[in-house]
């Protein structure tokens, strides 16, 4: 099965140019393709993973991806999908973000020891040295104002306002494609559905600049959720690929909590499971949704891909411990992950009567309530029900000398830090 047939099965083609010529090109030779990533933060998030994994799919099919980091365009700001002007970052900030993103991209693509190695590029290398006269004379003259105003990325901002800075973004991205076409023989640009206008503008610039040019564009569909909320966001914010921003446990939980209505679609979009494996999981969703086999497969595949096998095993262990209440089996680092958002209090490492600990840590509102909680069996210390009113929390209750986990009731956890 060819790459296009695989993408069609997965629902990964939104729009593409010249279907027949594009398919023939992919069948005939190893094609260089690119996708751009503007450094707007010091980490990629799962929304970025979608096109990154497209580059990976093409590489696995024998093609040569170029991961383009927008060190230049990142200082301008892409108006696509934005209702208001972006806040511009400083040159130093963009440079820092660029390096961070380059490091993350290297985790998903093979840059050496393969016949079709990926390439990393930074558009600041050519945009940073571009003078205004050359830009307007050699590039700008190829873009008619009416043509640009008709593009969705610009048209959608005309009423609310768009600066010349963001208005020029389309031209800069088009120049990226031309530069990569001329110097790297890059024939294909891929991007999100909101990039169609920028991609076709780049194709038009190549057509005007290069005789008999053959270049192509492909966009992937917007990732949606059946409940109408935005994909990739939680109450805690974006789901990042950096484990310091989003722990592997949180990352795993994000995928595990996928709605039954979305899980098969996400298996197709994000994983590298075979068609047969996905169809089998789809069958299990229909026949036994309560087993959540598809969600477990999705969480495992994505966490392993981004954070590795060891982090996946940790995430599964933390999830199982929280579900069963067997939290004493967790290490300190696993507790840090699993209890990141749990109410916590700092205490000195001294022996303390449990009743006093409950009140002083505001786990129980009063001593009377604390006594009731203990005698009623509502208090657990490191997963063990504790009903003795004279129980003293000692060194033996401090996991690795750092934590004591108190549970009140079925699911209300509190973390004591030492």
Curated annotation (Swiss-Prot):
L-tyrosine binds at residues 34, 169, 173. Gene3D superfamilies: HUPs, RNA-binding S4 domain, Tyrosyl-Transfer RNA Synthetase. One of its GO terms (molecular function) is tyrosine-tRNA ligase activity. It comes from the Bacteria. It holds the Pfam family tRNA-synt_1b. GO terms for biological process: tRNA aminoacylation; tyrosyl-tRNA aminoacylation. ATP binds at residue 233. Residues 352-418 form the S4 RNA-binding domain. It catalyses: tRNA(Tyr) + L-tyrosine + ATP = L-tyrosyl-tRNA(Tyr) + AMP + diphosphate + H(+). It is found in: Cytoplasm. PROSITE patterns: AA_TRNA_LIGASE_I, S4. SMART domains: S4. A motif ('HIGH' region) lies at residues 39-48. A motif ('KMSKS' region) lies at residues 230-234. Its EC number is 6.1.1.1. Keywords: Aminoacyl-tRNA synthetase, ATP-binding, Cytoplasm, Ligase, Nucleotide-binding, Protein biosynthesis, RNA-binding. GO terms for cellular component: cytosol. Disulfide bonds: none annotated. Belongs to the class-I aminoacyl-tRNA synthetase family. TyrS type 1 subfamily. Catalyzes the attachment of tyrosine to tRNA(Tyr) in a two-step reaction: tyrosine is first activated by ATP to form Tyr-AMP and then transferred to the acceptor end of tRNA(Tyr). This is Tyrosine--tRNA ligase 1. It comes from Bacillus cereus (strain ATCC 14579 / DSM 31 / CCUG 7414 / JCM 2152 / NBRC 15305 / NCIMB 9373 / NCTC 2599 / NRRL B-3711).
